[in-house]
């Protein structure tokens, strides 16, 4: 960012300036590319009371071989080094990711590399996808398309691992009082609203529409996997 401006600035400098704007209570910077994230940016997030404590850090695959075929410009080892840097500077950060299963040529060893990264990175959640051909892309023309039954089996194994790891990591907030930005009515429970903590974790609790847009304190009663059930604490 900012390299073509008359007075070049870094993305971290931009974030720092946005952080100074009065009236803003939450700033959400979500998705850096693994090859581009820098310590300066993480330090700005650490020092800010407004920038959300959440990094969406797309993995796609834990196999360095497949990452090269995907033209991702990083390796498994580099990705894990970046995760370590993020957690060193932001110890309580929530890290989420994207993962694709069944990319052409994916072997069992490649898939196990992905599972290994999930366990080591301790993601709070992961958006998991089954690879599908996109007309006109190099991957669609590749040989060694992975059989559908193999892809489905790997996808289910990945989901099981993600659920186990994320639940163990997310439940660290159980029993705590946390600030929640109320975003809307709960679609599944009458008389409930839903919101997000600064780390992007969803919280559902009893409340009415007048709370939407407010930041309130919620006691986190129970972790339900990727979200919490809680109760409003009156300030």
Where are the regions a protein language model picked out?
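A non-catalytic, amphipathic alpha-helix used as a structural packing/dimerization or gating element
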Residues: 81, 85, 113-120, 150-164
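Conserved, mostly hydrophobic/aromatic
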Residues: 29, 57, 98, 118, ...
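Short, hinge-like loop/turn segments at secondary-structure boundaries
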Residues: 45-47, 114, 143-146
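Radical SAM enzyme [4Fe-4S]-AdoMet core and its adjacent flexible, acidic
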Residues: 2-23, 70-73, 133-164
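Glycine-rich phosphate-binding active-site loops on the catalytic face of alpha/beta enzymes
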Residues: 125-131
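Thr-Gly-centered strand-to-loop micro-motif
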Residues: 32, 69, 126, 205-206
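Conserved SAM/AdoMet-binding glycine-rich loop
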Residues: 1-108, 119
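Terminal RNA-binding accessory module
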Residues: 141-235
